[in-house]
Amino acid sequence: MRELEAKATKDVERNLSRDLVQEEEQLMEEKKKKKDDKKKKEAAQKKATEQKIKVPEQIKPSVSQPQPANSDNGTSTATSTNNNAKRATASNQQPPPPQQQQPQQEQQQQQPQALPRYPREVPPRFRHQEHKQLLKRGQHFPVIAANLGSAVKVLNSQSESSAVTNQQPQNNGEVQNSKSQSDINHNTSGSHYENCQRGPVSSTSDCSTSCKNAVNDLLEKEAWPSAPGSDPELAPECIDADSASNSESERNITVMASGNTGGEKDGLRNSTGLGSQSKFVVGSSSNNVGHGSSTGPWGFPHGALISTCQVSVDAPESKPESSNNRMNAWGTVSSSSNGGLNPSTLNSASNHGAWPVLENNGLALKGPVGSGSSGINIQCSTIGQMPNNQNINSKVSGSSTHGTWGSLQETCEPEVSGTQKVSFSGQPQNITTETTGPNNTTNFMTSSLPNSGSVQNNELPTSNPGAWRVSTMNHPQIQAPSVMNGTSLSHLSNGESKTGGSYGTTWGAYGSNYSGDKCAGPNGQANGDTVNATLMQPGINGPMGTNFQVNTNKGGGVWEPGTVNSQSSPWGSGNGANSGGSRRGWGSPAQNTGTGLSSVEWNKLPSNQHSNDSANGNGKKLTNGWKSTEEDDQGSATSQTNEQNSVWAKAGGTVESDGSAESTGRLEEKVTGESQSRDRRKIDQHTLLQSIVNRTDLDPRVLSNSGWGQTPIKQNTAWDTETSPRGERKTDNGTEAWGSSATQTFNSGACTDKTSPNSNDTSSVSGWGDPKPTLRWGDSKGSNCQGGWEDDSAATGMIKSNQWGGCKEDKSTWNDSQKSKQGWGDGQKSSQGWSISAGDNWGESSRSNHWGEANKKSSSGGSDSDRSISGWNELGKTSSFTWGNNINPNNSSGWDESSKPNSSQGWGDPPKCNQSLGWGDSSKPVSSPDWNKQQDIVGSWGIPPATSKPPGTGWLGGPIPAPAKEEEPTGWEEPSPESIRRKMEIDDGTSAWGDPSKYNYKNVNMWNKNIPEASGRSDQQAQMHRLLPAASAVSSKETSSGSGWGEPWAEPSTPATTVDNGTSAWGKPIDSGPSWGEPITAASNASTWGSSSVGPQSLSKSGPKSMQDGWCGDDMPLPGSRPTGWEEEEDVEIGMWNSNSSQELNSSLNWPPYTKKMSSKGLSGKKRRRERGMMKGGNKQEDAWINPFVKQFSNISFSRDSPEENVQSNKMDLSGGMLQDKRMEIDKHSLNIGDYNRTVGKGPGSRPQISKESSMERNPYFDKNGNPNMFGVGNTAAQPRGMQQPPAQPLSSSQPNLRAQVPPPLLSPQVPVSLLKYAPNNGGLNPLFGPQQVAMLNQLSQLNQLSQISQLQRLLAQQQRAQSQRSAPSANRQQQDQQGRPLSVQQQMMQQSRQLDPSLLVKQQTPPSQQPLHQPAMKSFLDNVMPHTTPELQKGPSPVNAFSNFPIGLNSNLNVNMDMNSIKEPQSRLRKWTTVDSMSVNTSLDQNSSKHGAISSGFRLEESPFVPYDFMNSSTSPASPPGSIGDGWPRAKSPNGSSSVNWPPEFRPGEPWKGYPNIDPETDPYVTPGSVINSLSINTVREVDHLRDRNSGSSSSLNTTLPSTSAWSSIRASNYNVPLSSTAQSTSARNSDSKLTWSPGSVTNTSLAHELWKVPLPPKNITAPSRPPPGLTGQKPPLSTWDNSPLRVGGGWGNSDARYTPGSSWGESSSGRITNWLVLKNLTPQIDGSTLRTLCMQHGPLITFHLNLPHGNALVRYSSKEEVVKAQKSLHMCVLGNTTILAEFASEEEISRFFAQSQSLTPSPGWQSLGSSQSRLGSLDCSHSFSSRTDVNHWNGAGLSGANCGDLHGTSLWGTPHYSTSLWGPPSSDPRGISSPSPINAFLSVDHLGGGGESM
C-alpha cells in the first residue's frame, strides 16, 4: 500500500510538478502581479498579522522555504505543525521528489509572492492564527507546502500557516491514504514531529505519543474545552516550536492541519491523530481529538477540525470548550457524519450542531479566525473537509468527511471508505481550499489535498477524487468518482487537473482531479495552481470546492456529473454535505455546513457564538465563519466567494483556479487587489477555466453555475469591476449576492470579531469578520462594504469586497436595503451575513445565481444546485438541505434548525427573528427554516418576501425592500410589473448579465432575469434563498425577493415581486419559464443539472441561450432555481407558501426536475404554487390566481400537464420537448433519476417534486411540521409526489378527467370540498380550508391519486408523450412554454397529487377518457420513475422522513411515492402495497416508517382490495392522514383510485362498517398490526377489529378500533400536525389525534367509530359517547382530559384514545363481540380499586375483577353480556377519581391476551386481554408506528403506534417503554406514550408486541 501510495504520490507529485510548473508559470505571472499588491497589502497585513500573531513571521520563513515534501511529508508536516518551527525545518529538510521540489520550490517562491496576497487576503488575525498553528505544524507544512509548491506558495502567501495548512492537508491526504502513508509522512517529514503532530502516526512515537498523550490528556482533562489551555501542554509536547499564542494559533492550524492531516485516519483517529490535530485540535480541538478524535464522530477530524476551529484558541479555553461542545456536537454530528448519511445529515446536523459548533470552534479559534477563520473555515471547512479529509474520512472516509462535509460524505461515504479517505484528503484539499479561502487553512488543506491527492492518487486516486469526487459527490458519481477517482482522479487530478487547468477545472478537474490535481498537479505546482484551483476548490469545496467540486465534477465533465453530485454533493449533496463542504458554505453546507454551519453556525454560532467567544468576531465570523468563514473562507477568503463569485461567476472553475491557489492567491489576489484578483481570476480563472475543459464543458455550466451564463465572464468582468467594492459588488450583484455573499459571509459578522483584530482582513475571513463590516455592512456595510468590506477585507474585503465589498455596496443596498440587515449585516451578519453569506456565499455560490443558479446551477452544476438546494435542502434540503436536509437535511433541520435559531440568531440575528425567522421565520416553516426556509424562504427568502415583510424586515435592510416586496405576497404583484420587466429582463437578464450595470442589482435580477419576474429574483430568491438566503431573502425578502439583493435586488425585487405576476407573470414566467423554460428545458435541465449533464449541457448549450435566454437557460436551471425563484416567488407569492415549497421545491425543485418543473412550473408550478400558495398563503393573489390558474391550467390542461410532464420528464430541460416522457424514462433510467439524484441529491427527481409538492401541499404543514426535511423530504416527497403528481397532473392536465377519474363519491360530493381542501393542500385553494380539511383532501387526492396512480401514471405517461409530442413541436420557447406548462401541469399534477386541488378542481373536470390514460401513464410513470427513482427516493427517504415529520403534510403522494420511491422498494412497494404484502410492506414501511409514518405500515399493507385505496389511503394518510385516515372519508371519498374503489363503504354510524369486508384480520393473512393500520380508518378499524376478532373472533373489536382510526383520521386531518402516521397513526396516531379530533369533534369519528369500531351503537357507542369513540367520547370529560394532556400528547389520547381506540371495550366489544368481559381503561393508579370494583359490582356480580392499574386498566367479568353492556354503559366515560373510565367490551381473546400479557409482558399484560384488542390496535399502531415513525416522532408519546412499532421497530419513541407499565400506569403520566393505561399496552399487548409485533 505504501509502495502504491508512494508511487501514486510520486506520480501525483510529478504530475503536480508538471502542473505546477505549467500553472506556476501562470501563477508566477499572476502572482508577480499580485505579489506587489500582496507585498503592499501584506506589509500592512503583516503588521496586523504580527500584531495579532507573531508566529506567522516565524512560520513564514519555514513555510516560505518548505521543501516539497513528499505527500508523506504531509503527515509529518501536519505533525510538524505541532512544532511548526522544528517541523517546518524538518519538513523542509525533507526533500520532496526533485520534480516536486522544483515546482514546489518555484511555487513556494511564488507563494511567498502569493503569501503577501494571502495575508492580505486573510486577515492577519486569521492568518496569524492559522499561521501560528500552521507554522508550528507548518514545519511540516512547509514540506507539504513544498509538495504543494504552489499550494505552498499559496500557503506562503497565506502565510506560513497556510503553508502549514497546505502541507498538513497533504499529510492528511497521505495519511488518509493510509496510516502507512501517515507513517511515511512521518518518516518523510521528521517522523518524530510528524507523528507527534499526526498523533496518528506512531512512527514518531515520541512526538506522536506526546501529542497523543497531550491530546489525550487534554482530552481526558477535557482539554477540549481547555484545549487552548491544554494546548500549551500539547504545544510543549507536540508543539515545541509553538509559542503559546503560536500554539493556539498553530494549534488551530494544527488542528486544521491535523484535522486535515490528523484528519488522516491516524491523526484523526487518534485523538492524537489529532495530535497534530490534537494540537490543533487539541489546542483547538483537542477535544476533537478527544473526540476520538472526534475522529470518531469527528472521526473526522471534524471534530478536530472543528475543534480546532474552535480552538482557534482565540477563545482559547472557553472556546475550546465550546468547541468541545461543538466539537462534540460535531462529534456527534460527526458521528453522524461518520454515519454517512449523516454526512449530509451530519453536515446538516453536524454542520448544524457540529458545524456550528465547528464554527463555534472556529470561533473559538477566533484568533485564527483570520487565518483561523481560514483555519476554521478550513477547519470548518476543513472540518467539514478535513473531517472529510480526515479519516473519518478514512473511515467514512470521504464519506464521512464529506459526511462531515456531509454531502460528500453522503456521497462518498460508502464509496470510499478507503477511497474516501483519500477523498478526504481531497476534501482536505477542499479544506485546503477552504483554507485558502481562509488563507492558511485552505492552503493547508490544499496542500493536503495535493498530497492527499497524491496519496489519494496513490492510494485512492479514485478515492481522492473520489474523495473529492466522492466527496464531491463523486459519489454520486461514485461511479464517476471511481473512475474519476482512480483514473480520472489521478489523471484528472493530475492530468486533468492539469488539464483542468485543472484549476479551472480544478474545479472541474479538480473535483475529479481534485486529488489528483492536487497530487498530480505536482504538489507544488498543482498545488500552487491547482492548489490554487484546488485549494480554492477545496475552499470552495467548502465553498467553492464543492463548487469546484462541482466544477470539478463538472469540470471535468465531472463537473456536471461529479459536480452535480459532487458539487451536488458539495453543493447539492456535498452541498448538502459539504456543501457542505463546498460551499459547504455555499451550498449545502452552507446548507449543511454552511448551513449547518452557517446555518447553525450561523445560527448557532452567531447566536452562540463564539461569535461571542473571544473571537466574537471569530465566533461570529466563524459563525458566519463557516458560512462566512467557511464560506468566506471558502468563498471569501478564498476570495472564493468572490472568486467564487468570480469563479463562480466565472465558472466556479475559474474560481477554482482563481480560487484555488488563486483562491489562495486569489484570495490573496483579491486581497491583493481585486483587479489583480480579477486579472488573475480572469487570467487564471479564465485561462484555466477557459483553458480547462472547465471552460469548455464546465464553462457553460460553470458560467451557468456562475449563474452568469456566459456573461458570467462578463460578470466576472463585472466582477472584475470589482475594483470598487461597489463596482465589484455591483458586479457582484448577481454575484453580489455573491459578493454579498462573501460579504455576507463575512458578514457573519462574528467574523467581524475576527475581523476585529484586523479585521478587515479577517474580514476576509474576517471579512467575515468583517461581518463587522458585515455589521458594518449591515450597518455600515456601505462603508464597510466598500471600504470596510472591500476595504475591510481589502483583499479579503476585496474578496468579500468583491463579494461583499461590492456587495457591500450592494450590501449597501443590502445594507441599505437591508440595512439591515444591517442586521444582516449586523446581526445578521449572520443572518444576513450568512444569509447572504451563505446565501451570498452561497449566493455567491449561487452567486446567487450561481449558487442559486449554481445553487441550482451549480447545483445544477452539480445538479447540485438542486442538491445544493437539496443540500440546502437541502440541504439537506437535502440535505439540505438540507439546506440540507437538510437540509436538510438538512438541514434543513440543520438548516432549519440552524437557521432557525440561527436565523434567529444568526442569520439574521437581526432578522433574527425574522430572519431567522425571517428567513427563518418565514421560512420558519421551512425549516431549514433558514434554508429550508430559505427554501422556505424562499419562502423565507422568498417567503420573506412574502412573509418577508418581516423577514424582509428580518432582512432588515434588505428586507425592507423585500418587505415591500414582501409586502407582497401581494407584493408579488408589484413584482408583477417587474415581472414583466423582469421578463424583459429575462431576455435582458442575459443581456443584463453582460451588463450588470444595467440592472445594477438587476444584475442580480438579471440573474434572475431568468426568473422573469420574480423569477430572477425568485430564482435568486430561491437560489438565494437557498443560496443566499440573504440574497434571496434579501432579494426575495428584501425585495420580496423581489428586492433582489438589496435594493438593487429590491429593484429587481420588484420584478420579483412581479411574481405576483408571478402568477400573472406566470404567464410570462411561463414565458419566462419557457424563457428560461427553454433553457429550462434545456437549461432547466441544464438546470437539471440534474440531468445535469444534459441539462447543464443543455444548459450549457442552452446555457448561453438559456443564459441568454436566460440566463434563462442558464437560469433555466435556475428555473429550478427560478422555479425556485419562481417557487420562491411563488413562495413569496404564496406568501411563503412555499417558501419552502417554493424554495424547497425550488430547491428541491430547484433541482432541475423541479427546476424544470418549477421552471415551467415556475409558471405553472408557480402559478399553482401560487394558487396553492395563495390559497395556502391565502394570499390575495393566490386565490385569484388560483382560479385563473386553475382555469388556465384547465384550459391549458395540456400546458399544465405539460409542465408537469416536463417536470416529470425532469427533462424539461432536455428537450424542452416533453422530456416528461424522457423524464419518465430518465426517471426510469437512473439517468434522469441520477440527474434527479444529483439534482435532488437523492432521487431528486422524486424528491424535488415531492419537495415541491410537499412544500406546496405540505407547505403549510410542512412548514409547520416538517419544514425540516423540506428539502430532503420535500424533495423526495415532491418527487415521489411528482411521480404521483403526474397522476395529479393528468388530473391537472385533464381536469375533467381528473374529475371523471375521481370517483363520484369523491368528486361529486366532495368536489367542492375536496377540491377546496385539496386546494388547501395545494395551497391554491388553501385559504378555504384548514389544515385538517386540507389534510383530508390531501388524502383524498392521494387516495385518488394513489388509486389512480397507475392510471394517472399511465395516462400521464401518455399525456406526457402526447404533450411532449405536442410540446415537442413547439420546441423552443413556446415549447418550453408549453413544456413549462406541462411542467406546470406536471407540477400541478404533483401538487394535485398532493392537493388534488387542481386535480380535483381543475382536473376533476378532466374527462374520464383521460383517466385511463392517466392511470396507465401514472402507473408507467410510477413504475418507470418510481422504480428508478426508488433508489433515489430511498435516498430521498430521509426527505420523506422529513415529511414524515408532517405526515399529513406529506401527501399520500409523498408517502406513496416515498414509499414507493423513497422507500427502498418504491415500486415494488407500490406493488407490495398493491399486492398488499403486509409484512413486506410493513417492513418496507418500517423502513419507510421513518419516511412516512403512516404510509409505511398501514398504508399499503392493509388489504390488497383496498390497496389502491389503501395505498392511497395510507399514502394519503401519511400525507394527509387526517382526511384520509382519520376520516377515512377522504379515502372513502378519495378512493378516486379505481382500486380504491369504492372505498369501503362509508361507515355509517350505527352500522357496522362494510368496508374491506374481505379483509378479516382473523382470516386475512395479510392482516397484521401494520396491515390493520394500513387502512387506518377502515382498514385499521377492521383490522383492529379483526385483530380483536382474532382474539374475540368478532370483528366488532376491529370496528371499535376503527372509529378511532377513523376518528384519528379525522383527527389527524384536524391535527394535521400529527399527520405523520396518518395511517400508521391512524390507530395510534389517530388515537392520539382521535383524541384530539374526537375530543374536539368526534362526530365523524363517531360515525366512523361506530362503523369502524363497530361500536355497538347500543352499547356505549350508541350512547352519546357513541358518536365519538367511547373513550374519546367522553369528549367532555375526556375531552378535557384527553385533550388535556394525554390526549394530544398521546398520553392523553394514548389514554383515552388508545384505550377506547382499541375501542375494544367500548366500541367493538360492545358491539358484536360483547363478551362478559368489560375492560375498564384509562384508570389511574390513584383510582381506588375497591371503589372501582364496587362501581362494577353495581351492574352485576363480578365473576372476575382484575385491576391492573399499572396499565391503567381493569378487566371485569360479569356473568352475562347484558350486565357487561349495562356496566359498560354505566362505567364508560364514568368519572372516577381523577380519571374518566373508559369501559370497553373485551373479547375473551383479548382478555386472555390481557392476562397473558400482564403475566408475561409488562404490566401491559394486565391489559392483555384488552390489549388484545388494543393489541390489534396496537398492531395498527405498531404498523403505524412505522408509518408514523414520524408521527411517532411527532407522536412521541402519542405515537401509540410509535410505541408499538417503536418497540417493534425500535421506534424508540415508545421505546416500548412499555409505557406499558409506566405509560400505561398513568395514562397521563406518559403523555407521550399513550398515557392511557392500557390502551397502548393493549395495543402493544404482548400479542402485538410479541406476536403482533413479530408479525409486524
UniProtKB/Swiss-Prot annotation:
A GO MF term: molecular adaptor activity
Interaction with argonaute family proteins: annotated span: 1-917
PTM annotation (Phosphothreonine): residues: T1406
Function: Plays a role in RNA-mediated gene silencing by both micro-RNAs (miRNAs) and short interfering RNAs (siRNAs). Required for miRNA-dependent repression of translation and for siRNA-dependent endonucleolytic cleavage of complementary mRNAs by argonaute family proteins. As a scaffolding protein, associates with argonaute proteins bound to partially complementary mRNAs, and can simultaneously recruit CCR4-NOT and PAN deadenylase complexes.
Description of the deletion phenotype: Development up until embryonic stage 9.5 dpc is normal. After this point, mortality rates increase rapidly with less than 5% survival at stage 12.5 dpc. The yolk sac endoderm is abnormally thin with fewer mitotic cells. In addition there are fewer blood islands in the yolk sac, associated with impaired hematopoiesis. Expression of many miRNA-regulated genes in the yolk sac is abnormal, and in particular there is marked derepression of genes involved in regulation of apoptosis and the cell cycle. miRNA biogenesis is not affected.
Regions of compositional bias (Low complexity) in chain numbering: 69-93, 101-113, 430-443, 858-871, 1143-1163, 1284-1296, 1360-1376
Bias-annotated ranges (Polar residues): 396-410, 417-429, 444-461, 591-617, 635-647, 703-722, 738-766, 876-906, 924-937, 1033-1042, 1054-1064, 1082-1105
Alphabetical list of PANTHER family matching this protein: TRINUCLEOTIDE REPEAT-CONTAINING GENE 6 (PTHR13020), TRINUCLEOTIDE REPEAT-CONTAINING GENE 6A PROTEIN (PTHR13020:SF28)
Pfam families, A to Z: Ago_hook, TNRC6-PABC_bdg
Basic residues composition-biased segments: 125-137
Record field: compositional bias (Basic and acidic residues): 1-21, 39-57, 665-683, 723-733
Segments forming domain RRM: 1716-1788
Region (Disordered): 1-137, 159-209, 222-250, 257-276, 396-461, 548-683, 703-998, 1011-1126, 1143-1182, 1234-1256, 1273-1306, 1360-1395, 1512-1570, 1659-1685
Start and end residues of each stretch annotated as Sufficient for interaction with AGO1 and AGO4: 551-1279
GO cellular component: cytosol; Golgi apparatus; nucleoplasm; P-body; perinuclear region of cytoplasm; RISC complex
InterPro entries: Argonaute_hook_dom (IPR019486), GW182_domain (IPR052068), Nucleotide-bd_a/b_plait_sf (IPR012677), RBD_domain_sf (IPR035979), TNRC6_PABC-bd (IPR032226), TNRC6A_RRM (IPR034924)
Region (Sufficient for interaction with AGO1, AGO3 and AGO4): 239-488
Subcellular location: Cytoplasm, P-body
UniProt similarity note: Belongs to the GW182 family.
Full protein name: Trinucleotide repeat-containing gene 6A protein
Gene name linked to the record: Tnrc6a
GO biological process assignments: cellular response to starvation; endoderm development; maintenance of protein location in cell; miRNA-mediated gene silencing by inhibition of translation; P-body assembly; positive regulation of nuclear-transcribed mRNA catabolic process, deadenylation-dependent decay; positive regulation of nuclear-transcribed mRNA poly(A) tail shortening; regulatory ncRNA-mediated gene silencing
Biased composition (Gly residues): 573-584
Location of region: Sufficient for interaction with AGO2: 255-331, 303-384, 325-424, 394-480, 487-736, 1059-1129, 1605-1896
Modification Phosphoserine, positions: S724, S863, S976, S1197, S1255, S1520, S1804, S1825
Keyword set, alphabetical order: Cytoplasm, Phosphoprotein, RNA-binding, RNA-mediated gene silencing, Translation regulation
Assembly description: Interacts with AGO2. Interacts with AGO1, AGO3 and AGO4. Interacts with CNOT1; the interaction is direct and mediates the association with the CCR4-NOT complex. Interacts with ZC3H12A. Interacts with SND1. Interacts with GARRE1.
